[in-house]
Amino acid sequence: MGNVFDKAGNELKTPVAFHPGEFLLEEIEERGLKKTEFAKSIGLLPGNLSELFKGKRHINARIAVKLEMTLGISAEYWLGLQSAYDLQVARELVHV
């Protein structure tokens, strides 16, 4: 990732963001949930859930609300993870 600086030119340490699908996969596995059943419970096809785990799909507001209802982890948290990841990717692309 490229360096990020404030207006005074001081380098800022940016945390490494990860795709929220990675965290979701860990959460599902820790709870002992079956992936196919979980996909149905949040209104996704199993293949789409798999793509989410791999970072090939994003968590949008609808999915975030479904995750909140199913897992008890706020929609804002899921969207925050997605936003942090998206910003990191955008910064990397700008600094290439």
Give names to the regions the model predicted.
Residues 68-69, 77-80:
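Short, compact, well-ordered microdomains
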Residues 33-51:
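Short alpha-helical DNA-recognition segment
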Residues 56-70:
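Short, basic-rich loop-to-helix N-cap that marks the start of a DNA-contacting helix
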Residues 79-96:
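Short, charged recognition helix plus adjacent turn
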Residues 6-34, 80:
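A short, Lys/Arg-rich alpha-helix, primarily the initiator
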